Amino acid sequence: MEDYKLLQLETATVDAQAPPLPTKTVPVFAPPLSTPPQPNELVYTKRRRTKRKAKCRCLFFTMGMFALGVLMTTAILVSTFILTVPIGALRTAPCPAETFGLGDECVRPVLLNASSNTRNISGVGAVCEEYSEMAASNGTAGLIMSLLDCLNVGDSESVMNKLNLDDTQLAYCNVPSFAECYTKGFGVCYAARPLSPLGELIYKARQALRLDHIIPFPR
């Protein structure tokens, strides 16, 4: 019994002399406390926002002025083109059938009955009205018919084919073998060459702007 008590005392003495074991501490991270901004920081933030807004407004203003300038320049160019384009440049459409182009006009040679009163200019005008065209003077008609006769010398069909007159009575009457053509006269009708699609657009634009009385545009 005494030996057991001595053993307990020795064990307690050793335990008292042993160094304490290290303990592990776990750090606890706490969220930082929000500190109120200083007065200098508030002023700097407000100035930075003001500068951003000013830059955005300046950019929008510059882009708007650029777009406005482009639109105004386009409008000026289009208006100048509509007002100053020559009429001859817009009459580029081909002439109708049984006519041929002569400058800005489409010429239509027509045959007339010699016994009727269609040899004078008023009679030719009545024939031309059927085609919504005007009658050329006798001198002009004679020059045009003489020109056709000169072109047809040696080959009676090639010129008529080129002038889009191959299926007309005038083409047959240029051949001397048709005796019935001797009893007929001739006349010349003419009209302005048709407008091209661009010419039609410009003509309608001038009508919409009511500029016909300032800048004549014969239809």
UniProtKB/Swiss-Prot annotation:
Residues 79-219 are virion surface. Residues 1-57 are intravirion. Its main location: virion. N-glycosylated. GO terms for cellular component: membrane; viral envelope; virion membrane. It is a single-pass type II membrane protein. It is found in: Virion membrane. Keywords: Glycoprotein, Membrane, Signal-anchor, Transmembrane, Transmembrane helix, Viral envelope protein, Virion. Pfam families: UL45. The chain crosses the membrane at residues 58-78. Glycans are attached at residues 113, 120, 138. Belongs to the herpesviridae HHV-1 UL45 family. This is Envelope protein UL45 homolog. It comes from Equine herpesvirus 1 (strain Ab4p).
